[in-house]
Regions:
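N-terminal Sec-dependent signal peptide, specifically the hydrophobic helical h-region
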Residues: 1-26, 47, 51
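Proline-enriched interdomain boundary motifs that mark the N-terminal boundary
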Residues: 21-27, 117-126
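Conserved aromatic anchor
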Residues: 33-45, 78, 131-148
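Structural signature of extracellular immunoglobulin-like
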Residues: 38-42, 50-55, 89-98, 136-142, ...
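Recognizes extended acidic, P/S/T-rich segments that occur
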Residues: 51-85, 154-182
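Beta-strand-rich modules
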Residues: 76-102, 176-201
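Extracellular fibronectin type III
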Residues: 98-118, 196-213
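Membrane-proximal extracellular "stem/stalk" segments
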Residues: 149, 159-213
Length: 213
């Protein structure tokens, strides 16, 4: 905070635009491999435009992000250029205002799609039949497109007594038939998405309860 105040004072003394302050924070937010870079703007960002670049960790060359040059918003979708889960990436942002004043570049933390993305829980669809409960799972589409060969689901069946059973389903178009259930009994179910080779899983989905026939 003291350093920030000193920088503000220096800018005022030199009569330079406030945009020359470094951006305060760059942060990747990644859900289901949709990788969005967010940044906190300078204190006075009126009429500022932002320019975003990216590179692979270890590579010398910075590349412009298409669609994120001269933008006024405070975020940029880098999913297309940070799509390889085996790589690590950096991004950087600088601000510009008319007539041509520019801030210094601000660097993001190093980012890994594989390790930093969060996995969304799937959506459960339940049907009741004379034979029991039919469970279908709808995963997030971006995750299926990216990782469908490595996905599976854990299904949790909770009995009235509180006892819990666990089942597994493969991705992505299968259904699970739960036949060993009692008639006219309430059961609650949850599911989570698992990426096996990464040992990564989502939170459990919201609980859905049904009563058998």
């Amino acid at each position: 905070l003291l350093l920030l105040l000193l920088l503000l004072l220096l800018l005022l003394l030199l009569r330079l635009p406030l945009l020359l302050l470094l951006l305060l924070l760059l942060l990747f937010e990644s859900v289901d491999y949709k990788n969005i870079l967010h940044w906190t703007p300078p204190i006075n960002d009126t009429s500022l435009q932002y320019y975003v670049q990216w590179k692979i960790y270890g590579e010398p060359q910075w590349l412009d992000v298409d669609g994120c040059q001269g933008i006024e918003k405070h975020h940029c979708d880098l999913s297309g250029v940070t799509s390889d889960p085996r790589e690590w990436y950096y991004a950087r942002v600088h601000a510009s205002s008319k007539p041509a004043s520019k801030s210094a570049w601000t660097l993001s933390p190093r980012f890994s799609p594989r390790w930093d993305t969060k996995i969304s829980p799937p959506v459960l669809k339940l049907n009741i039949t004379e034979q029991g409960i039919v469970v279908r799972v709808k995963p997030p589409r971006p995750l299926v497109r990216k990782m469908h060969n490595d996905l599976f689901y854990k299904i949790y069946l909770v009995h009235n007594s509180g006892a819990e059973e666990e089942f597994e389903m493969e991705c992505c178009f299968h259904k699970l038939n739960l036949k060993k259930v009692k008639h006219k009994e309430e059961y609650c179910l949850q599911a989570e998405t698992v990426i096996a080779f990464q040992a990564k899983s989502s939170d459990r989905s919201p609980e859905k309860c049904v009563t058998t026939l």
